[in-house]
Amino acid sequence: MNSAQVMNLGQLLNQSSRQFPQRIGLIQGDQQWTWHQLQERVHAMAHALQQLGVQKGDKILAQSRNNVQMFESCWVAFQLGCVWVPTNFRLSPPEVAYLAQSSHANVIICESVFAQHIDAALAAAPTLKHVIAIGPARPTEHSYEDLVTRNLGQQPSETVVSYDDPLWYFYTSGTTGKPKAGILTHGQMSFVVTNHLADLIPGTNENDCSIAVAPLSHGAGIHALLNVARGAPTILLPTEKLIPEMFWQLVEKHRVTNLFTVPTIVKMLVEDEAVDRYDHSSLKYLIYAGAPMYRADQKFALQKLGNVLVQYFGLGEVTGCITVLPKHMHSADDANPNANIGSCGRPRTGMQVAVLKEDLSPAAQGEIGEICCRGPAVFAGYYGNEDATQKALRGGWFHTGDLGYLDDRGFLFISGRQSDMYISGGSNVYPKEVEEVILNHPDVAEVAIVGMPDPKWGEVGVAVIVKRDEHKNLSGEDILAFLDGKTARYRWPRHIQFWSALPKSGYGKVAKKDIQALLQQQEHSQ
């Protein structure tokens, strides 16, 4: 354990308020807040919670859509030395109850519209003592805005932290079982913010502007920290649903320079006709992560937006800090060696990346193994789950569960999740390789391939395809004919289905577990 004192990450907000008190820090709809106003509100809420008995180490659960209170809640937690436990607001009451119980939450900051979630959390978590309602408060609850109003001008007592003091429980869904709380610490996150600024949005300052298109509870929240550190404002969408037309309007109006999202959202935004009606020349960095981006989608985005794409690869446990493919390493020209087709880039600054075999020895160049990393961005473990921690950190490396290989330059190529790979007739099949080929078909918009049990082959691939035009006549035979000569036959999906849409997670990732479950339901109903 590292007991050395470090800067409380909450100081980032204080520093921007001191440097740029009258500059805008947050915008949502027709409302905006200066850095000074945000700091005053955060100090007021932190003081109010201290008066309620909240102290260092307590856990603050946050269940809310993106709004100023959700944005502030992490800074309140950080400055108090508490642990921020954000949820995806789309979770059900039982799912939020599990997070409250497993994190031993002491406080819940929650929008009033999620009253059922509050009640479920209170029933499941005996540690939960205080409910702070965003919106109308019930008799047993405190109103967020009332607490802020009554405590404006008050200063919370300063909380000193050490390197290993936790500040965020980053829940990861994983491939099996219940979500696990990855412990992010003040020391680790100070490195992460510095690393992201250096590798993802270098040169960002108070004259830049960011827009959040995903819930602040995960990657979008981490990206918001970077902009706070540089005094750059963040725009929150005024609607729960992402509307491409509105997005491009906001980019033009506020001269947005950077954003973080996932490949499916990039695809949706650049394929919408609104992209051609608004000025997006201010964009410097469109950062994508969370899932592979198919080459066809990457090329289209580059053609529409110019050289602004930045890819990073990483998991919540290392807050994305494994590899980066900067914008100068992207190209829409397949013949350009700097296109780095299929690669997710080079190791992040200060991080070491390795591909290991099952015995933890290094895989040869070009040999597929498990992608592992080590460095200051690695988390402190899973809260209350020592077995999972030991498994994830065995041999002195963080094990991602992703498969890939390194080329002669040390650039990383991902083959897929260990859990995505299936074995058909004794051969390992990595769906991503086949998905890439199918996506080059002009009539295919989206595709996902999953392994399903088969009495003859052990497992076979099932491809689920979304057509660009639902009225287009496209058959499974057409897809197989397209694959012929482009990839080995043993990799071909055994079954092909056409769906109107692919199920996605709350963060826009294709949910392969849900696809498998739906396919199993089909099988059982036959």
Label the predicted regions.
Residues 5, 31, 46-94, 213, ...:
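Conserved AMP-binding/adenylate-forming
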Residues 14, 51-52, 79-148, 469:
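Structural core segment of the AMP-binding/adenylate-forming
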Residues 22, 133, 139, 152-171, ...:
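Conserved pre-ATP/AMP-binding loop-to-beta segment of ANL
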Residues 34-36, 167-194:
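Conserved AMP-binding A3 loop
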Residues 91, 108-110, 259, 375, ...:
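AMP-binding/adenylate-forming catalytic core of the ANL superfamily
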Residues 190-209, 217-257, 272:
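Conserved AMP-binding/adenylation subdomain of ANL enzymes
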Residues 256-261, 270-339, 352:
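Gly/Ser/Thr-rich phosphate-binding loop
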Residues 346-350, 359-391, 429:
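Conserved ATP/PPi-binding loop(s) of AMP-dependent carboxylate-activating enzymes
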